[in-house]
């Protein structure tokens, strides 16, 4: 449930090349529940933001200046809703391409009366490139992205050197890239990419993974995995410059 893994070139030729970028997600058709459809019908006009051609003034969007986090691939939105509800003093931006998930999140926003959350329903790389100002995010979260297990599909993984550089450009100095995966080989791969990415510091004492941070909600899927003895690996990297 994550996005493409290469940064588009901003030229007319690049526009054509952008359409050929390898995507890290596959669009899936899915039925909408009544609640999800309600979320889209009633919530989208206010809470879903269009792709812009220039960086968005989120102080104006949210009506305040506050710490700002962005989550790529929020799935059905349970974790993002929980984080937004637990931290009303912060603002959250979620990116997800799958409509049932967007509808579920928006239904939760309406039900809980949240005002500190906005959504993009499109490719996160386009959102980062076109809508997010440089040095503006306090945190970017990437929880349980598709690991694309087969070697021939590794090029589809969102975590690539180009992604690390793009994220670094959008984080403030001191901002955090927080990733989590339930597949240890992908955690090792993330470490390989991030440990050589310039301008970052691994926050793990051992240079590997951090203990599960309290601010990341535990999902039902994760609890089930824990009962089965499956692990989860959290990685945190701080932008130095």
From Swiss-Prot:
PROSITE patterns: SAM_MT_TRMB (PS51625). The keyword Transferase applies. Belongs to the class I-like SAM-binding methyltransferase superfamily. TrmB family. Catalyzes the formation of N(7)-methylguanine at position 46 (m7G46) in tRNA. Substrate binds at residues 150, 182, 219-222. GO terms for cellular component: tRNA methyltransferase complex. Pathway: tRNA modification; N(7)-methylguanine-tRNA biosynthesis. Keywords: Methyltransferase, S-adenosyl-L-methionine, Transferase, tRNA processing. InterPro entries: SAM-dependent_MTases_sf, tRNA_(Gua-N-7)_MeTrfase_Trmb, tRNA_methyltr_TrmB_bact. Residues 1-10 have a biased composition (Polar residues). GO terms for molecular function: tRNA (guanine(46)-N7)-methyltransferase activity. The keyword S-adenosyl-L-methionine applies. Its EC number is 2.1.1.33. Residues 1-20 are annotated as: Disordered. Pfam families: Methyltransf_4. The active site is at 146. It catalyses: guanosine(46) in tRNA + S-adenosyl-L-methionine = N(7)-methylguanosine(46) in tRNA + S-adenosyl-L-homocysteine. This is tRNA (guanine-N(7)-)-methyltransferase. It is an enzyme of class 2 (transferase). Signal peptide: none annotated. S-adenosyl-L-methionine binds at residues 71, 96, 123, 146.
């Amino acid at each position: 449930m994550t996005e493409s893994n290469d940064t588009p070139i901003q030229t007319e030729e690049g526009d054509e090349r952008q359409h050929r970028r390898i995507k890290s997600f596959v669009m899936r058709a899915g039925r909408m529940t009544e609640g999800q459809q309600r979320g889209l019908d009633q919530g989208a006009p206010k809470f879903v933001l269009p792709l812009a051609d220039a960086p968005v003034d989120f102080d104006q969007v949210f009506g305040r200046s506050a710490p700002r986090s962005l989550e790529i691939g929020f799935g059905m939105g349970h974790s993002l809703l929980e984080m937004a509800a637990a931290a009303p003093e912060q603002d959250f931006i979620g990116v997800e391409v799958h409509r049932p998930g967007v509808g579920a999140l928006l239904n939760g926003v309406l039900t809980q009366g949240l005002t500190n959350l906005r959504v993009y329903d499109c490719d996160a790389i386009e959102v980062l490139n076109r809508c997010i100002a440089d040095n503006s995010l306090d945190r970017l979260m990437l929880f349980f992205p598709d690991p694309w297990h087969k070697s021939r599909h590794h090029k589809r993984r969102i975590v690539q050197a180009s992604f690390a550089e793009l994220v670094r450009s959008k984080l403030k100095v001191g901002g955090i890239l927080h990733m989590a995966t339930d597949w240890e080989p992908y955690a090792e791969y993330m470490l390989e990419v991030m440990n050589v990415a310039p301008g970052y510091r691994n926050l793990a004492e051992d240079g590997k993974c951090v203990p599960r941070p309290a601010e990341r909600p535990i999902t039902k899927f994760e609890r089930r995995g824990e009962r089965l003895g499956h692990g989860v690996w959290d990685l945190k990297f701080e932008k130095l410059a």
